[in-house]
Regions:
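Sec-dependent signal peptide recognition
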Residues: 2-7
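C-terminal motif of bacterial Sec signal peptides marking the signal peptidase cleavage site
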Residues: 13-16
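Bacterial signal peptide processing site
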Residues: 18-20
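Tryptophan-anchored aromatic micro-motifs
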Residues: 22-49, 85
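N-terminal glycine/threonine-rich, aromatic-flanked beta-hairpin/loop signature
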Residues: 44-87
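Edge beta-strand at a domain terminus
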Residues: 73-85, 116-136
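An anionic, turn-rich surface loop/hairpin at beta-sheet edges
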Residues: 87-108
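Low-complexity, intrinsically disordered Gly/Pro/Thr-rich segments
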Residues: 105-121
Length: 136
């Protein structure tokens, strides 16, 4: 009997912990890939490449680390931005300062565990489908 109660208590604890982990509508880790074109320095020709981007929101979702790079190169950029969330519309924006600063990245939750991220690369608008990795 004691063993059954212990197992039930463990299951209840696990279920409640899982609910606590999923209590925030925005996952804290996202990543995705997108196609880019880069100029070959030797030939001057445009070459297709695949770039990756990841977002890691702080526990309180007030900041976000954006990390990106080209898959077949070793250059990776990593920068922290301020995050502003709109729970009603399930959107977020990232910028370098206060709320009125220029928006550098913006995204919207499209489905459970899916998000569309937008940003400009030069003059070109880039849209990337991101997948979530974990909740906190």
């Amino acid at each position: 009997m004691k063993r059954i109660l212990t197992i039930l208590a463990a299951l209840i604890c696990l279920c409640s912990c899982e609910k606590l982990e999923q209590s925030h509508w925005l996952y804290n880790m996202w990543s995705g890939e997108y196609d880019i074109t880069m100029t070959n320095n030797d030939t001057g020709e445009q070459e297709p490449h695949i770039a990756g981007i990841s977002l890691e929101f702080s526990d309180d979702r007030s900041e976000c680390i954006v990390q990106g790079g080209v898959k077949d190169h070793y250059t990776v950029t990593k920068k922290t931005y301020k995050a502003y969330l709109n729970e009603t519309e399930k959107i977020f924006v990232l910028n370098e300062g206060d709320y009125d600063s220029r928006i550098l990245y913006w995204g919207q939750i499209t489905a459970a565990g899916k998000c569309t991220l937008n940003f400009y690369s030069g003059d070109k608008l880039v849209t990337v489908e991101l997948a979530a990795h974990k909740l906190e």
